[in-house]
Amino acid sequence: MLIALPAIAERLPDPVAAGWQGKPVCEILHEDGALRVFRCTFPPGVGHERHFHATHFGYALSGGTMRITDASGTREVTLTTGSSFFSDGIPWHEVVNVGETAVSYLMIEPK
């Protein structure tokens, strides 16, 4: 099920276009008419500037501790390598790796 995101998402970059201090953090691995697959990597102290997400599935290639800020506030989340998640979409959030190890996600978005 695809959902409509609020208007704020129309003014923000998607996760591939968003970066950190002018540098990309995500790389497209595959894209076709049905889906887009990309990997985002965050060394310690590196984050992802404010962006939105369409419907997506995520898989933690390497876990760690991320600080996430969104409409509900700021929290720290520890991801375990091999964990996965699904989201119908995120109007906006920004994250930063506050741990001591690199964090890497594989993201899959249906089109």
Positions of predicted regions on the chain:
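Boundary at the C-terminal end of the N-terminal hydrophobic targeting segment
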Residues: 7-9
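Short acidic-glycine-tyrosine-enriched beta hairpin
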Residues: 31, 72-90
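Ligand-binding loop in jelly-roll beta-barrel domains
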Residues: 90-111
